[in-house]
Amino acid sequence: MFRHSSRLLARATTMGWRRPFSTDLPAETAADSTFVEAWKKLIPNVDPPKTPSAYMAPRPATPSSIPSKLTVNFVLPYSSELAGKEVDMVIIPATTGQMGVLPGHVATIAELKPGVMSVHEGNDVSKYFVSGGFAFIHANSFADIIAVEAVPLDRIDANLVQKGLAEFTQKLNTASTDVEKAEAQIGVDVHSALNAALTG
């Protein structure tokens, strides 16, 4: 198989055709024109339907330069913590791990898990504990972060966190139904993340 690869590669590079990527738009709609001609031969009195390629729009041009700042909107169900704030970087606790977002980041949707979100602006770092939510990172250097609950890290009482962790651990150990176990597990997960945020 490998001994033929150089010959196949040479043949592929010298041929005049190019296989487009799945996201590329076709240079010409040859398949559409063939379809329209066949349609008009069979049913000349009815306009041909539009094919999927008729609805495709060209991709917007990629900006030539990356903005120097990331614009962040950080929203809770009951308030807006940050609205149009220009920052250098945001680190979010995604379910896939800690995710740093800089200006020019690729468009992404990330689910948030309980953890610390840090907002970096120059030498200042603001830290929030988020219980969960979603982050929508747009290609134009905007980030919309929606959290179920968020508290500035400096407003969290470490003693209450320890007390809550012990309480939910006890509930988890004594839970008898699946619902009780699930509720206790959520409490343990959130308080463990709070404890880790305060101690580390």
From Swiss-Prot:
**Which family does the entry's similarity section mention?**
Belongs to the ATPase epsilon chain family.
The name under which this protein is listed is ATP synthase subunit delta', mitochondrial
Subunit composition and interactions: F-type ATPases have 2 components, CF(1) - the catalytic core - and CF(0) - the membrane proton channel. CF(1) has five subunits: alpha(3), beta(3), gamma(1), delta(1), epsilon(1). CF(0) has three main subunits: a, b and c.
Q: Where in the chain are disulfide-linked cysteines found?
A: none
* Free-text function comment from the UniProt entry: Mitochondrial membrane ATP synthase (F(1)F(0) ATP synthase or Complex V) produces ATP from ADP in the presence of a proton gradient across the membrane which is generated by electron transport complexes of the respiratory chain. F-type ATPases consist of two structural domains, F(1) - containing the extramembraneous catalytic core, and F(0) - containing the membrane proton channel, linked together by a central stalk and a peripheral stalk. During catalysis, ATP turnover in the catalytic domain of F(1) is coupled via a rotary mechanism of the central stalk subunits to proton translocation.
Q: Any idea where this protein resides?
A: Mitochondrion; Mitochondrion inner membrane
**Keywords per UniProt:** ATP synthesis, CF(1), Hydrogen ion transport, Ion transport, Membrane, Mitochondrion, Mitochondrion inner membrane, Transit peptide, Transport
Q: What Gene Ontology molecular function terms does this protein carry? A: proton-transporting ATP synthase activity, rotational mechanism
Origin, by domain of life? Eukaryota
Give the organism the record lists. Answer: Ipomoea batatas
